[in-house]
Amino acid sequence: MSTIETDIDVADETEVVEQSPDRGQLSSLLLQRDGVLTKDLLLTPGKFGLGKVPAKTRPDSTTNMVCGFCSTGCGLNVHLARGEAINLTPVTDYPVNLGMACPKGWEALNVLKADDRATEPLLRDSRGKLAPTDWNTALSTFRDRFKAIQQQHGDDSVAFISTGQIATEEMALLGSVAKFGMNMLHGDGNTRQCMASAVVAYKQAFGFDAPPYTYADFEESDVIVLVGGNLCIAHPIMWQRISRNPHNPEIIVVDPRRTETAMAATQHLAIEPKSDLTLFYGLANILIERGWIDREFIQQHTNDFDAFAEHVRQFPPHEVAAATGIDEEQLHRVAETIHQGRRVSFWWTMGVNQSYEGVRTAQSLINLALMTGNIGRPGTGANSITGQCNAMGSRLFSNTTGLLGGHDFENAEHREKIAGLLNISAERIPDRNSLPYDRIIEGILRGKIKGLWVIATNPFHSWINQNMARDVLERLDFLVVQDMYRSTETAERADLLLPAAGWGEKEGTFINSERRIGLLKKVATAPGQALSDFRIFKLLAHYWGCGEMFSQWTDPAATFEILKRISKGQPCDFTGIRDYRQIDECGGIQWPLPEAPSGDDAAEPATDVTTQEQGRRLFADRKFYHADGRAKFIFEMPRKMPEPPSKKFPYLLMTGRGSASQWHTQTRTAKSKVLRQLAPRSVYVEINADDARREGIRTNARVRVESQRGRIVAKAFVTRTIPPGQVFVAMHYEVTNQLTHAHFDPYSRQPSYKDCAVSIRPLSSHEVSH
């Protein structure tokens, strides 16, 4: 086998981490005579001013593509010079962001230039050090080590953990190569950490994982209910869409903390943590008792309402008030607000999903939408907001815990269908589901899984209860990490590191929260020997000996055609999309978009998307995806919190996004000097002012936060925005998950990151000095 050669050099662009300037530094900065453009200004002063820019930053062409950070899926104009991206601006008429971008989007290109990019394969040597190697050795080592583990311990002894941040085509190829070619039964994505509860909730209630909305619904609602999400910080462009709403909507925020979003709400329900389910059952009970429900819709389009109505009778207002901390008067006011709204939309994100009862909580919101008929119309819906840029693509096409295109591994007809479409034997397709993420971790702890392949995610930072996660990685016989950076907490512990291209350095598609398929383009060259994930998967298939199975998967565009065929007849059917060019011309296209019928079946014309598509919502026809076309009311009694506060650990820790400028584990965003300066670099903990006074804690004092699993040191942020008895630490810091408690929703197996008991106290003078 020949080695892979490359003549791409790595630019040396080392960044220096600086503190935010004080007044003196700022004055010096403003008066300095030597900056990055000083020479250009002196030599060619006539080229500056009146909007002119120096030649090296002047574009000669522009293209547009979708952002690679969150699930909003904004359109960005990327300005090119000599075929390489030099800067970007938001697309003014892209139907998602309408000319807006958050700080992360503005900095999307700059994070590609970091000096810790993975530029060549690295293999751990006999001294335990990661040392450069060639691609031939790297690919051969991958094959030989994983095959040896399978031969000794069985096929199920190796697994992979994937992501929601590579292209859909890459996800599909990865899952297919691993499961159909390499016999890796077990593979899951980090989307398990953010969206699994919403997926299960939708599947059980609607019959398919189908977020029903379009972003235009933010602007068409007259009542907007936001649950467990701080849109101002986590999804700022979505908050901008709400701000554009011309109907002066009532905005109800359900969140224990007085977040930036809660401050802007017309009603803030500062509930007791994890009392959401009780709250929504109580609201349903009031709506039913007052007759504020859509009986016609319920009778014609749903099942199991009578049992649900009987269930919520167990949640009278006085008991709900006692459990949630929301007084009866406010409960009735919220119910009346929902009743009076003509277009009511219910939105939720991680505060619901990342819970030990996330599925049922999400379904309690779906129940409210169904019983009031607020679905399938503009400005309505039970709407889950996704986290990662391509979590929706992962949910449908990653071939991890579900067969490609929303099919089922355990369904023989589905296996035969996919095998026929891929021209492979159905025997190659597993007839059982993968272990979910937490069970893969458990399998490693029990010695059942010996080899792990991690792609574009950082579990050593992000997985719940880091002490357990670190123990897991140390028990592996072989760990492969495939990433664009060599410095992630997980990559540094790899036995083999495969350098990957990032967003903007490859092609493919993403699917955003509103089901919009958007285009990813190659506008920059990956550094060194880094390759696209698609290319790496193809090479690994070749080295493994299963490359012929994927001979039709020649490139992302060809793979998109394969996925179109797989989607046919499914709720996510997008066979009506002609090609990448049409996606580009239309400003993205939402699924479903089936191909135009022909012949006798052409009674109804297909949707016309020849011009720019603004948005389409699901269930306008009142038909759901269960066999009988009806939606289901699903419910059960709330569970007790697994680890409530105690005498030793009297505070409840919540985690979440702390800044609009940082993203997940900061793998990319920490590379931007601008983004670093927009967020606290030191770990901080929010604590209520009364609690701080009682504990003797002052603002900015260093404190110790401790749980049963670990302890961290942080700076205290004393505030009234968090209620007494609760503390908050942002998820972006590596130490945060040293505290969290590993427990999971029983249906989705999604981790519950937002509830564990901790203590907090100031550091002693001796501890501070050391």
Where does each model-flagged region fall?
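N-terminal export/assembly segments and adjacent metallocofactor-ligating motifs
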Residues: M1-R290, F308, Q314, E319, ...
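Long, contiguous, secondary-structure-rich segments that constitute the structural scaffold
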Residues: D7-Q32, P527-C586, A670-E686, D690-H770
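N-terminal leader/propeptide and maturation segments of large enzyme subunits in energy/redox metabolism
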Residues: D125-P132, N285, R290-E328, L404-I429, ...
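Flexible, glycine/charged-enriched surface loops at secondary-structure junctions
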Residues: H153-S157, I293-I298, S345, G376-N383, ...
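Conserved short loop/turn motifs at secondary-structure junctions
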Residues: A159-A167, A323-I326, T349-Y356, Q388, ...
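Extended redox/cofactor-interaction regions of prokaryotic respiratory oxidoreductases
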Residues: A172-V254, L277-Y281, A369-E492, A501-G508, ...
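Flexible glycine/proline-enriched surface loops and loop-helix/loop-strand junctions
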Residues: I224, A264-A265, F315-H318, W347-V352, ...
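Short beta-alpha connecting loops at secondary-structure transitions
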Residues: M263-I271, P499-A501, E505, R515-P527
